[in-house]
Amino acid sequence: MKLSRFIYIVFMMMPFIGTNSFGQNFDQIKQYKVSFSIAIKGTEKLLAIRSFANNNQKYLLLVNTETLDTKVDLAGNYNTSSLKWPKVMATFKNSPYVKALQSAAAKDLQLQNAGIDHSIPKEKGIALTIDLCPSHKNLDRIIFQSVFEEFKKIEQPAPLAISVSGKWMLKHQNDLNWLKGLVQKNELDITWINHSYHHEVNNLPLTENFLLAPGTNLDVEVLENEKLMLKNGLIPSVFFRFPGLVSNQSTVDKIEFYGLIPVGSDAWLAKGQMPNSGSIVLIHGNGNEEIGVKDFIQLLKNKQIDVKNKQWLLFDLRQGLEKEFDR
């Protein structure tokens, strides 16, 4: 993408900037449902993927299909026309959003790591994703502090994505508020990824584990987690990360029918997978993955000179996919 076009997109999308990480706390959500429609306000054409009521006002969760940014806004601010999911895919077929969905679906037969696993082609750097699965341990704050300290002179706020589960949010309000504070202080720019509500794990084979466990209710895992995110002032992104990176063709299809793009990883550090240029790096920040955290801190140390010379950067997952599919 040419620099002039990138600047133009950033300027035109200013209403999204600053609202895609967190917003108001919606603590009286009712009638929350999957609802697709074209939403038009002036020259702005967005895709609504959710509708809900809060304090007797109707809201929409909106997606910019070109930049993959999301925001929540009053439904009354837009002229809307409802769409069925096949029509969504047809209407926005040339957008990075639909192309990313199609790319993710192409890997839906994999039991592990289905979805997008490589973000930024031919770029020097990575897209960092940090998973917050349920845990009784405190947040590994050193990860976020290290990112800010390393990149503050090069990229501020530093972009990263957090895959957050419902059970983690319920038990770690102080840590969640601390993360939101980093965004408010303009230290980090966080993309919030849905990581399911319960994130159940058992001792069964992977084909019957995580979201593939018998009795799993995807409406609860997806929509209740989004509601909890909104209650905590987090704006859900268009991304979904499968717990354990485990899925099958059916669950991938169902997640995409919610309008969400499955995101995997080609560099799970704790498993010894080293990142390449454009990798989507995965570490756990929930206190349960000491090896992955140490490996990431060491990676930052090894890349210090490249960071200072702007030869190794953190990339926003959304912008990386926009570059990949905006062709």
Where are these regions (language model features)?
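Metal-dependent polysaccharide deacetylase catalytic core of the NodB/CE4 family, i.e.
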Residues: 152-253, 257-282
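Active-site metal-binding loops of divalent metal-dependent hydrolases
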Residues: 130-134, 196
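Terminal accessory/targeting
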Residues: 1-129, 139-141, 145-161, 167-174, ...
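Short acidic donor-binding/metal-coordinating loop in glycosyltransferase active sites
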Residues: 132, 242, 285
